[in-house]
Design a protein with these regions (language model features):
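Charged DNA-binding/catalytic regions of mobile-element recombinases
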Residues: 1-258
Length: 258
């Protein structure tokens, strides 16, 4: 029970039974195999539980459908390799100093957050900086971006000329949701919802001191959360491994096939 509580507290106090079970059985904690029913019983006894997600809301103005590229995803968010499909979206965070906005770019295959940015306005630079971070990371890793599909909603930030130029320079193909609802970009919306539940509105997390103060605090804590999400948080869609572990597996497989 002591180990289980420590794991829960060291991981933003967000693990429910499924993630706790996956974590205990994939990390070197010296506890051996732990049955799911045992995890459930002990968590109930300790009074600890996972967080509940809120449904994310759209915050960006939409470009007209006729001014957007085709929807190449059609709500099928699957990818067999890295850089096959990226999704991008923007969410908002209330602070005592006013609203701040957060942009993410995620690789669908590994679920890894490749780029992110926090800003005080919804200008194009918010989304563009997140995209450039993702592109730079792939270049450092020597992973080819040619032919990748970049999917987003119809937010005007993603239809800006500079954003299109950045995609063209890395030989990426733009895709935009066709109907304009949240299901058009469901995987990115799901990440926003996780971010809100596990960090922004999580009053149980260690270090919680009340409402967010300002952009600087959100930026600092978002950086820490993204690192944790990529390297420590088991993802059930990945079989209980982390996004970084999924990336490592794909990289190893690619090298063996070369």
């Amino acid at each position: 029970m002591r180990v289980m509580r420590q794991v829960w507290e060291e991981n933003y106090c967000v693990f429910g039974v499924r993630k706790m079970h996956a974590f205990l059985n994939t990390h070197e904690l010296g506890v051996g195999h732990v049955a799911r029913c045992t995890v459930e019983r002990l968590m109930r006894r300790m009074g600890i539980r996972g967080v509940s997600r809120r449904r994310a809301r759209h915050v960006t103005a939409s470009a007209p459908r006729h001014a957007c590229p085709l929807d190449l995803v059609n709500r099928h968010f699957g990818a067999h390799d890295l850089n096959e499909l990226w999704v991008a979206d923007i969410t908002y965070v209330p602070t005592q100093a006013g609203w701040v906005y957060v942009a993410f770019v995620t690789d669908v295959c590994s679920r890894k957050i490749l780029g992110w940015k926090v800003a005080s306005s919804l200008r194009t630079d918010l989304a563009l900086d997140a995209l450039n971070m993702a592109i730079c990371q792939r270049r450092r890793e020597n992973i080819d971006t040619r032919g990748l599909v970049h999917h987003s909603d119809r937010g005007v930030q993603y239809r800006d000329v500079r954003y299109g130029q950045a995609l063209a320079q890395c030989k990426a193909i733009a895709s935009v949701g066709s109907t304009g609802d949240s299901y058009d970009n469901a995987l990115a919306e799901a990440l926003n919802s996780l971010y809100k539940a596990e960090l922004i509105y999580n009053t149980a997390r260690p270090g919680y001191t009340g409402p967010w103060r300002d952009q600087r605090e959100v930026e600092r804590e978002t950086s820490a959360w993204v690192h944790w999400y990529n390297t420590s948080r088991p993802h059930l869609a990945l079989g209980g491994i982390t996004p970084q572990q999924a990336e490592n597996k794909h990289t190893t497989t690619r090298k063996k096939a070369a």
